[in-house]
Amino acid sequence: RRILGEGVPQHRIEQLVVETFASYARYWVDSFRLPQMPVQAIDEGMNFVGVDHIWRAVDAGVGPILVLPHLGGWEWAGFWLSLVGGFDVTAVVEPLEPPDLFDFFTAFREELGMHIVALGPDAGAAVLRAINEAHVLCLLADRDIEGTGIEVDFFGERTTLPAGPATLALRTGAPLLPTACYFKPTGGIQCLVEPPVPVRREAKRLREDVTRITQDLARALEGLIRRAPEQWHMQQPNWPSDYDALEAIGKPHPRPGQP
């Protein structure tokens, strides 16, 4: 309802909830299917809009930062960029439990040419190295997992989003490219790469510039998600009011940064 607004009938909301779980199931099916797919099939299933923004950055010798929501099938695009586009691709991912599941996903992503960095203390150095080596860097940025992010307005409510994309762009000059990869009804993926979000120093304090740019990214992510809200796989609480509501019914969920 945050995405669609108050005027949308309840039955439509319920229908989209069902479609969201169907989309999430498709994500998992594709995840297990992609390693067995021939490169030609990955190429034929991909419609890439805005890939010129990526080429422009790499040709200039700097790795672009693709800022993505947890939506659709971003891994298909990552494999296409690596196997068909010939790019070096680095993705920062959330560690999964149990560790065997994380190791499985890391292995199949690396098998198809992606470099995987686990979110954690060593991630910063790894992503700086990737940008300097002109890798395409994929950052999922619609959820503040560590609880150390920037407060923004996101779909009409205050929450926090990761500071990493804006901070990296300010420090390296890497372009920030809002990106989303949508499931097509007939199979395959349509990936949309938008023009760069403006990145420049304006304030005396770096934190103020990071806040401004992160808010701009939040607005860009809103637009991408609204194109296909049923494909947004946000299956966890993401706003303070979500946690408050769960606590009110006796089902508390750890807040970001809490064990």
What kind of feature is each model-predicted range?
Residues 9-10, 14, 18, 56-58, ...:
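Non-catalytic C-terminal accessory region of glycerolipid acyltransferases
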Residues 60-121, 147-154:
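Catalytic core of membrane glycerolipid acyltransferases/transacylases, capturing the structured
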Residues 1-68, 73, 103-107, 111-113, ...:
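Membrane-anchoring hydrophobic helices of lipid-metabolizing enzymes
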Residues 49, 92, 192-194:
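Residues in well-ordered beta-strands of folded domains
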Residues 4, 34-37, 89, 148-149, ...:
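General secondary-structure edge motif
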Residues 29-30, 80-81, 102, 140-142:
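Short, flexible segments with low predicted structural confidence
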